[in-house]
Amino acid sequence: MTQTTDPIADDPRFPWEPPLAGTELEHLLGMLNRLRWTFRWKASGLDAEGLNKRLGPSELTLGGLLKHLASVEALKFTWEAFRTDPGEPWRSADWSSGDDWVFASAADDSPDQLYALYDESVTNARRVIDKAIADGGIDQLTEMGDDQGNHASLRRVVCDVIEEYGRHTGHADLLRENVDGLVGEDPPEGWRP
């Protein structure tokens, strides 16, 4: 990511803040980063009971969302964008039922496993994005496309992941409030996973 001298984005107390006046790329990656931090905060510090708690008739859980967003990070920025190996557990997963297994299987994973899987997926995705931008920029075409041979730009892939986070960070707000009453838009000053 391009370096900035923005007093907000460069404040180590608030690493999730996007720049106030950055480039398009800085804003795009800054928003993705902010959503990642906010989601991780909403899902943080819970035991298995908290990660598996549901709200109303929904089958969504914070544990399921952790594993789902880990899969989004891993698959969008490896296999879908560049046809590179996403690693385990994604490589050997049974995708015949779509991604339902991701949500359902999260209940079998420990909190430590879920947090590690998510954190590793985000770290790897950041590396892939940084390298791809250095090699070809945000406008480069990826392998993701439609059935007519049109390919999506890396910008489109990043926007798809932002959309996914927007949807599920909203779910995480409600699920976390239902677990222990935690509310808020941003992590508290100095928070780290």
Summary of predicted features, one role per range:
Residues 98-140, 153-166:
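Acidic/histidine-rich alpha-helical segments that form the ligand environment
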Residues 2-17, 25-100, 142-193:
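Short, contiguous alpha-helical
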Residues 21:
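Conserved FAD/dinucleotide-binding core of flavoprotein oxidoreductases
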